[in-house]
């Protein structure tokens, strides 16, 4: 590493800056083509999957991954590169779990580089390696623990998903203080950097975790919890107030005072303290209004202890801010007056020499921050921090005590009219200074919320926002602030922005075309959605058509794509069926679309979006659409007719232009298919369904008759469901997605080349991860059958692993659709695990079985488990996996639900202890321990009477050891 910090305890500590410095410190690799890049990734996967490989080679391959990403991004597009990276998911898990510090460090650097570069697009990597990374935080080796800690910080910052928070919550009850401390650190990142939309869903859980950290037994964890509380106060003050009231009195004092004890000691030390009377007399020269008698009283105590009513600190009243432990005098004499703010306390008056006096030290500067900002940033900070900032938060008594300060009177802005104020803020927004521009945008936000703005002010604000949006020099933060102001401005004044809308849309489309960051694009889409909601749909449609034909605003191709997407959303979601669309602006827009299609340089990019927009127009009003294109030439009409038919719209364009104007199209078959029930699928899937029904028997690789029967029943139910699901009527916007997915499914099934099959599987997996697989009704059953066949027959371990991950995602997203195929799914996953020596495949099988067990019907899971565990002779490999699955079942599900099945499954689990395999017997013990922890010893006692005493004692030992970690998750 180029930068390392060696602590006193030995070892090295790694920080985020250390990681960032070596992200691109890798050997350069020559890559000739995309095929060469894929081969190099395959070679990396082969070496990293083999845990017995030399560790130097594996460390080098982890660096190679970063080099391939850096040097290969010019040869392939972003989705292809991400697909290559996702194939290494199992390798990353193994590397992060490795016990050698060099491997873990390099894996942490590489994974941090990936998640920081690709963000949410690689969320599956971050979610899968977060658990092993948190596990490594607990190790005693500093280099390993800090590498894992830094990796978790990168993951939490860039992978903002609910799953990440769920995983972190599970460590709140960890027995290791390092893991709990790291959780508190990560909570600070979540509170400060996650989106408000996501935090709103989990804010209650966040508060509970912060509360747990504040009450932790470890002092460093408590300190991290207080920092997280300060961050919570900064971003969510109401929730912080509620949490403050829930804390014990002692914890409230800690939040109010922070490290006040250390500050108190330093202030009142023999060397640093000065008698208050002498300090005041030195600093009060020339200020005759301060009574010497009063000062003499104050030096001892300004409060009559007899008149003081002693009360305990209230838990219901929370102070607005912590009082600083030191007050600083700014009188001309430069004296400083240290005294505590505790009633009745005395200041030490030990005499000191002039050499020790603080009068000789340089005068500390006041913080340049305004008081409000200081209070917001350190409202619950410690006393020493307040003293460093030189903050003053005085009571009335304190103000009376301090010398009078001559302040220059502030100039009141009485002459500034509201219009002048708006002009001044707009001028700041257009400043070349980044700081001044940020301040101006912050001031602009409350201004645009004012409903009493004049028309001139609204026009000026709109022009300023458009200039800010088109300024390419703006940082990401400034752009986000501008878009927030945009949204508020539109919601408040949409009725007065009709003329401004056209220019605003042009700027938004142009900005969206140039942006590459997903989060920024998402915020631009949010602003466009606000426009869709606030403006009249007809006015928006006319405005978009005029913008499309505007000879001045010549948009780049990607901006035209953004316009077409906006137009499609407007027609599909915000335009009422039957609304009139027979307008000259729409006719001109259609002609412009044909012009774009005729341009060979742009047609490939724009044609799919143009087809969607045309289908959306047709669906709004068939009669008006027919009248709209009546003057088009025959070639254009033929192309429109063919486009509508290919997208499943009945009879294409109606022959007449008359009608009621609210005719609605109906979905029809895309093409003639051999299968009479397949009304919306391509022909190859109609025939594939027949072949699948015939060859389903070949899926069965189990020799057990009971398993065969379960699979046959499950297959029959699945085929019935697939036939029922094949006649669903579809809206036009999903037909293209269906065709794309069906092409991928066809490649998955018929391809004999493992690489080609792997590419198709990877694309399906990416669609599911990105949320683009929204057509479950038509493709779920077919995809499921393809996965089952690959799991049973494929010789490619990579393809099996990807299929297992897809099956887990399908179960998580649409568990109800898999209910009828529970037994078959479990059998196929077990088939994939048999006769494999790949460690990453075993990990994928365990994860998939866990997902199936916790999402599918409990009765079906218990049924298949019983069948496998009572086999004679017992199948050790399958039995071990099933026992792990049952263990997860009892760890995850509530006790009330499990009590109904515990008597059925326990005898089968105990019988499995007769296996000759030590791994099976060990898994049986862990399974019984999980049962005892979940349903209680009393419920399990009747079953334990049949066990040998030695085994009962062994189980009791494990129960006592695990009972503290078996609590339900938050």
From Swiss-Prot:
Highest taxon above the source species: Eukaryota
A single GO BP: mitotic spindle assembly
Chain positions covered by the region annotation Disordered: 314-377, 651-675
Key words of the record: Cytoplasm, Cytoskeleton, Microtubule
HEAT repeats mapped onto the chain: 905-943
SUPFAM superfamilies per record: ARM repeat
Main location: cytoplasm
Molecular function, one GO term: microtubule binding
GO CC annotations, alphabetized: basal cortex; cytoplasmic microtubule; kinetochore; microtubule organizing center; mitotic spindle; spindle microtubule
Subcellular location per the Swiss-Prot or TrEMBL entry: Cytoplasm, Cytoskeleton
Database matches in InterPro entries: ARM-like (IPR011989), ARM-type_fold (IPR016024), CLASP_N_dom (IPR024395), TOG (IPR034085)
Extent of Polar residues compositional bias: 344-355
Family in the record: Belongs to the CLASP family.
Function summary: Microtubule plus-end tracking protein that promotes the stabilization of dynamic microtubules.
Protein name as catalogued: Protein CLASP-3
């Amino acid at each position: 590493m180029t930068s390392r910090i060696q602590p006193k305890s030995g070892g090295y500590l790694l920080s985020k800056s250390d990681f960032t410095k070596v992200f691109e410190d890798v050997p350069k690799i020559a890559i000739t083509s995309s095929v060469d890049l894929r081969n190099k990734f395959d070679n990396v996967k082969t070496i990293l999957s083999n845990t017995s490989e030399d560790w130097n080679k594996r460390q080098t391959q982890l660096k190679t991954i970063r080099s391939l990403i850096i040097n290969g991004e010019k040869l392939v597009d972003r989705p292809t590169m991400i697909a290559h990276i996702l194939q290494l998911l199992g390798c990353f898990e193994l590397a992060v779990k490795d016990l050698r510090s060099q491997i873990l460090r390099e894996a942490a650097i590489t994974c941090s580089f990936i998640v920081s570069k690709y963000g949410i697009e690689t969320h599956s990597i971050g979610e899968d390696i977060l658990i092993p990374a948190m596990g490594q935080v607990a190790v005693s080796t500093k280099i390993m623990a800090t590498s894992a800690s830094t990796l978790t910080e990168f993951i939490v910052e860039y992978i903002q998903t609910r799953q990440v928070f769920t995983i972190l919550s599970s460590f709140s009850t960890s027995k290791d203080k390092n893991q709990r401390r790291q959780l508190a650190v990560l909570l600070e990142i979540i509170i400060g950097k996650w989106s408000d939309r996501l935090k709103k869903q989990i804010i209650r859980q966040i508060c509970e975790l912060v509360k747990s950290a504040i009450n932790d037994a470890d002092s460093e964890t408590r300190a991290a919890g207080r920092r997280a509380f300060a961050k919570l106060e900064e971003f969510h003050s109401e929730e912080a107030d509620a949490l403050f009231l829930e804390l014990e009195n002692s914890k409230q004092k800690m939040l109010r005072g922070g490290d006040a004890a250390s500050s108190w000691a330093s202030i009142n030390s023999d060397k640093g303290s000065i008698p208050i009377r002498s300090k005041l007399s030195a600093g009060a020269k020339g200020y005759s209004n301060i009574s010497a008698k009063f000062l003499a009283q104050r030096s001892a105590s300004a409060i009559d202890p007899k008149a003081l009513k002693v009360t305990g600190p209230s838990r219901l009243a929370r102070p607005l801010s912590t009082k600083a432990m030191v007050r600083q005098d700014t009188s001309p004499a430069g004296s400083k007056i240290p005294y505590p703010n505790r009633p009745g306390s005395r200041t030490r008056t030990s005499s000191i020499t002039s050499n020790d006096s603080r009068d000789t030290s340089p005068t500390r500067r006041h913080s340049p921050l305004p008081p409000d900002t200081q209070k917001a940033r350190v409202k619950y900070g410690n006393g020493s921090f307040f003293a460093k900032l030189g903050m003053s938060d005085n009571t009335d008594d304190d103000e009376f005590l301090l010398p009078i300060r001559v302040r220059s009177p502030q100039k009141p802005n009485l002459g500034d009219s509201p219009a002048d104020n708006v002009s001044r803020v707009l001028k700041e927004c257009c400043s070349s200074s980044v700081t001044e521009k940020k301040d101006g945008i912050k001031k602009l936000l409350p201004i645009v919320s004012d409903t009493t703005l004049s028309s001139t002010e609204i026009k000026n604000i709109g022009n300023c926002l458009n200039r800010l949006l088109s300024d390419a020099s703006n940082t990401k933060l400034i752009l986000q602030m501008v878009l927030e102001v945009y949204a508020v401005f539109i919601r408040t004044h949409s009725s007065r922005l009709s003329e401004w809308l056209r220019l605003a849309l042009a700027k938004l489309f142009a900005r969206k075309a140039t942006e590459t960051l997903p989060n920024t694009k998402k915020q631009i889409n949010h602003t466009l959605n606000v426009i869709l909601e606030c403006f009249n749909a007809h006015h928006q449609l006319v405005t978009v058509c005029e913008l499309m034909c505007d000879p001045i605003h010549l948009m780049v191709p990607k901006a035209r794509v953004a316009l077409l997407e906006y137009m499609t959303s407007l027609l599909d979601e915000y335009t009422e069926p039957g609304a009139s669309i027979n307008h000259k602006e729409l006719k001109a827009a259609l002609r412009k679309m044909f012009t774009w299609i005729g341009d060979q340089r742009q047609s490939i990019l724009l044609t799919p979006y143009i087809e969607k927009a045309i289908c959306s127009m047709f669906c709004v009003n068939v009669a008006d659409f027919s009248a709209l294109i009546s003057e088009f030439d025959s070639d254009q009409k033929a192309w429109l007719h063919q486009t509508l038919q290919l997208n499943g719209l009945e009879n294409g364009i109606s022959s007449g232009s008359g009608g009621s104007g609210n005719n609605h199209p109906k979905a029809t078959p895309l093409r003639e298919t051999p299968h009479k029930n397949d009304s919306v699928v391509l022909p190859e899937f109609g025939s594939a369904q027949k072949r699948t029904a015939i060859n389903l028997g070949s899926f069965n690789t189990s020799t057990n008759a009971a398993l065969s029967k379960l699979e046959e029943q499950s297959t029959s139910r699945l085929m019935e469901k697939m036939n029922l699901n094949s006649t669903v009527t579809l809206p036009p916007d999903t037909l293209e997605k269906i065709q794309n997915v069906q092409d991928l499914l066809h490649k998955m099934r018929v391809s004999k080349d493992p690489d080609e099959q792997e590419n198709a599987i990877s694309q399906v997996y990416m669609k599911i991860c990105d949320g683009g697989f929204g057509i479950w009704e038509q493709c779920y059953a077919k995809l499921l059958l393809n996965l089952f066949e690959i799991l049973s027959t494929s010789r490619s371990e990579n393809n099996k692993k990807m299929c297992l991950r897809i099956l887990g995602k399908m179960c998580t997203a649409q568990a109800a659709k898999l209910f009828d195929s529970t037994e078959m799914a479990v059998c196929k996953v077990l088939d994939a695990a048999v006769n494999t020596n790949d460690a990453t495949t075993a990990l994928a099988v365990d994860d998939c079985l866990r997902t199936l067990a916790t999402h599918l019907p409990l009765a079906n899971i218990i049924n298949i488990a019983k069948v496998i565990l009572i086999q004679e002779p017992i199948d050790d490999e399958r039995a071990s996996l099933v026992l792990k699955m049952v263990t997860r079942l009892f760890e995850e599900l509530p006790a009330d639900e499990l009590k109904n099945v515990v008597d059925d499954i326990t005898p089968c689990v105990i019988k499995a202890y007769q296996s000759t395999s030590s791994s099976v017997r060990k898994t049986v013990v862990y399974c019984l321990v999980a049962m005892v922890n979940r349903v209680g010893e009393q419920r399990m006692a009747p079953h334990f009477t049949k066990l040998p005493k030695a085994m009962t004692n062994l189980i009791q030992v494990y129960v006592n050891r695990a009972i503290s970690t078996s609590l339900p998750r938050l």
